[in-house]
């Protein structure tokens, strides 16, 4: 698989404003980034460094709740890498250039600011509760292909942080929730979002040898899997099915966490993922 023609597009601005976009043209600005995502309900994070931004671009980044959207890949194929809000930005000299370092958090506004009000007189299905909460949060909701939802009997009323409603509805139905790139994902614990399978092999970008891992799940015992590195492919997301096809191991796994690192001028342009065994239901 090729590892040339590295391409990115980065846009930034307050929601609803024009903002700016960089990355196109024959001489795109130098950008490096590191993104961390995991299958938990904690927020995902990213760090981005951009060299030689204009004063106008720097002013845009300094606005409250500035949203940054990053796509990256090869040629015209540039999947979404990260969407998040600027929580910290600083600019300093780097030789004859100036480098702006940005820290981002996935959906900080929705999780931080959204209070919801829900009230149901009779029994309410947890899927309805989750959908109504997502609507008030202003986020799209995606349910896994095999998610099942229970009813809460005798009515339900709540006013407060949206995350508490989501946790209540998911725990009642034996599900988990997380927010990834602006999408609220609801699924069974230890399972995948869809049945689509991505193959990771030397032919599709797998680098080096997979490393065996064992992680503790608090009161749920241990999970087993593999850490793998592969050429930049952000189309493979959290909780996706992956068929790992290497000399050491062949089998189906789910993406538990992923770190995406890139530099359009030099160095890394790859993903490192932790693949865990898919729990059979």
Residue ranges and their predicted role:
Residues 33-57, 61, 189-281:
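An acidic/polar, Gly/Ser/Thr-rich interaction patch typically located in mid-to-C-terminal regions
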Residues 58-68, 112-120, 239-245:
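Extended Gly/Ser/Thr-rich low-complexity repeat segments
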Residues 114-123, 152-156:
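Second-shell loop/turn segments in exported
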């Amino acid at each position: 698989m090729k590892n040339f023609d590295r391409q990115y597009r980065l846009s930034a601005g307050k929601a609803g404003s024009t903002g700016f976009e960089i990355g196109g043209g024959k001489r795109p600005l130098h950008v490096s980034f590191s993104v961390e995502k995991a299958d938990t309900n904690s927020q995902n994070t990213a760090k981005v460094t951009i060299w030689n931004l204009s004063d106008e671009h720097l002013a845009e980044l300094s606005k409250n709740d500035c949203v940054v959207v990053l796509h990256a890949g090869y040629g015209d194929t540039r999947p979404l890498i990260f969407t998040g809000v600027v929580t910290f930005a600083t600019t300093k000299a780097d030789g004859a250039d100036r480098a702006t370092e940005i820290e981002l958090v996935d959906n900080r506004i929705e999780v931080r600011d959204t209070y919801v009000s829900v009230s149901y007189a009779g029994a309410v299905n947890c899927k309805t509760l989750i959908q109504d909460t997502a609507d008030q949060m202003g986020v799209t909701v995606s349910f896994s292909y095999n998610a099942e939802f229970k009813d809460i009997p005798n009515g339900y009323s709540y006013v407060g942080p949206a995350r508490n409603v989501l946790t209540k509805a998911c725990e009642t139905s034996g599900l988990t929730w997380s927010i990834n790139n602006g999408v609220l994902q609801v699924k069974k614990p230890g399972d995948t979002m869809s049945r689509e399978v991505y193959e990771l092999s030397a032919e599709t970008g797998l680098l080096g040898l997979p490393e065996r891992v064992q992680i503790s799940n608090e009161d749920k015992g241990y999970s087993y899997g593999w850490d793998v590195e592969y050429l930049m492919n952000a189309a493979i997301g959290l909780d996706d099915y992956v068929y790992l096809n290497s000399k050491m191991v062949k089998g189906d796994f789910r993406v538990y966490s992923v770190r995406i690192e890139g530099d359009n001028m030099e160095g890394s342009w790859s993903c490192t993922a932790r693949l865990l065994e898919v729990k059979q239901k």
